[in-house]
Structures are given as structure tokens and as C-alpha cells.
């Protein structure tokens, strides 16, 4: 017994030594950008919880996907559409022959080379999606493959992608109904109509995507990321009239309650849009109403992606609070305007108490809202112990990745290795993966009793194995801890000092 205790103690010490050695090396490369980038790229990153499929692809890849689609590029707006009279060089299949046009398209479809002038970063960003929408509608499977492979190559273990596979058929269904402020009655009408067939058709779409991705997971993905998990959030277009928004929300809640691949819902499109602002409280009431009927469906909401000047000051005072208290959001996306909320300190304390994680999108906030450095609330959330995780938002349009988000956190906010490790663990702990957590606390000090010895010895006991088999979340958390062990161990070697 004494031998076993000493053995376990020595292993735990070795883990601590490896973590300390890794932290020491990390501290030594703060002013060496290339080494820092290499370190962060190799570091396990857990999950990317805020990622839109519609913005995930690089423009170059979208042009490649659409090369056989017989689409035409508008010479001034660079939007694509079917046009039988299209002449070279504006056919998608031929744009690469014109160096200037090819690069103009990439700039128009992304934030590459963007300089504020005739349009703001906000306006340029939100204008990109309509330009390549026909490609998105037809090539979601290829975009999914791109997103998954990129995540795998960045040592990401889990991806929650926002997606609307039905091309807003749910919203079109809603447009056939007059608004009824009695949400119970409106829901009943929609359920008697075509909501469930739309839900079932979406699940069939996911079956198709899964088959497409299987070739990757059976091929390079088998070695690259054998433990990778992909789940979806059904996204709702908030810049639509109330009946359409409610029909989309109902579709999302029904879908997430039926298909385990869909773990929750989110609202997308510009939060400062005309209808988004006008109907914000109503939309939160809709989400809250459906939450009571579908309590197991998780909710992440874009809230507080606003700054003074973009909307009136009165519009900055309540969005995050309504998302938390009325819509019962489990997570908040962006949360940039938190300091302008009424009773902001009380709200921060409430979010900390309820453990409502904020998905922090540093590159996105800099490009769209011009908020970065000390103007960003990331340190404010940390000060009040509100959990946060780093995410990409629209990595293709923004020309970024998750590694870059970690680098920004280090360079701009001097986050330590242990802080980064906490954010990585947060991304799985606060994910919408089902099942109990491997950890009894959100500080990652106390694993569940059945896995405590396994974590300290590095060997999976039968009891822990059985527990992990009951929980997708705990299983991914275990895999993450193993990734950290493998990542940190080499830093004990002398050549890293």
C-alpha cells in the first residue's frame, strides 16, 4: 500500500513538474514571436465553441468549390449568381486567369487588405456573406470538411458549428402565418403545419454531411485527430419578422431535442440590425418561452456585439441581461458592451454565479467593432470571475484561426500558460456535449471520485472507464488531459531550459 501511495505521489509530482517546466519555457519565449506561434499551434486547444459555418471557408477555397457551378461574378459588387450570358473573365471557372479580378474577389469576400473608408469594417464584414451565398448553399459539405480538417491540424478536440442546413425553409414557413403574441397558440399552429418535416429533412442533411466527412475520418483524420468530435448549433436569422424568427427557433428547439448531433441553438446576423434592435426583447421572450418547453436544449446567444455609435446608448443597456435572465442563455457570444449594461457589476456577478461562459472572439471584435487591447472587456470578465473561452467566429472571412486568438491573448493581455490551460479546459467544460463533467469544480482541482486515481496515475481504471462511457463530455475532458500530458512531458528535458 505504501509503495502504491508513493508511486501515485511520484506520478502526480511528475505531472506538476512537466506543467511547471512548460510554463517556464512559455515565459521564456514571450518576446520570440516564431517560437510563441509554434508553441501555441502545438498546444492542445480543447474546443472552438463560436464558429459559423457560413464564415469558415477561405475565399480561395470557395472559388475552387464553385469552379463547376456555372456561376458569374458581378464586376463591381463581386457577388455571384447564375447568369447564362456571363462572359469571361467573370465566370467563376475562369477568374483565376485574371490576377487582378481574382484578388479583388478574395478581398471582397473577406477582411483581407481591408481599409476603412467608404465602408466600415462592420459593414464590409456583414456584406461578404450575401456575395458568396450561392456557393455556401451548394457546398456546405466541402466547407464542413475544411473546417474540421483545419481544427484537427490546430489540435482542436471539439467543434460546435453554427449552421442552417434548411436554407431558412423554417423562416419561409413562418412567413405564411400572421403574428400571434400568444406564443403557445403560434407554436401549435406551426407544429400542425410543416415544422416536423423540416426538422426530419435537416437530420437527413446531417446524414449526408456525415457520409462526406467519413472519408476524412477514415483517412488522414484517423491519425490526425482520432478523438475529434463535431456537433452543431442550429442558427436562427434574427433580422427577420417575428413569425419567421419564432418558426426558426421552434425548428431549432425541436431539432436539438430529436437529433443528438445538434446540441443547441443560436441567433445570428447583425445584432445592430433594424429588426434585431426593434424586436430584441421579443426575441428573448421567444427563446425563454421555448426554453421552458424544451429545458434540455442548450442556448448560446450573440449578445452585446455592440459599441457606442453603432447603436444609440439606450441600445447598449440591456441585451446581455435579457439574454441571461429572459432567454436563459447558457453561454454568451461576444459580450463586448458589458460595461454599458445597466447595473453592470451586478450582472457580471450574476454571470459568474450562474457560470455563464462568454465566448471571446478577439480578431472578430477588432475587425468588426474596432475593439481591441485595453478597450476589450476580456480582463473585466476575468476580474469578476466570469468564465471565458477563446473562439474564432468566422475564421475564413476574418483570415484567422484559433492559434491566433491565443496569441492575441498572450501578446495583448499577458496571459500565462496556466491561464491559457484554464481557458482550454473551459471550452470543453462549458461545451454543450452531453453528460456529467470529469471535474467536480470549475477550477479543475477536484476530479470525480471514480477517475481521481486514473488522472493521477495516467492509467484508466475500469471504474473510470465505465464513467467515461456514460458521458461524452467527460470522455472529451479525459482525452484533453491526456493531450496536455503528452504536450507538457518533453519540456522537462534540459534543452528546453
For each of these PLM feature ranges, what is it?
Residues 15-497:
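Metal-cofactor-binding active-site regions of metalloenzymes
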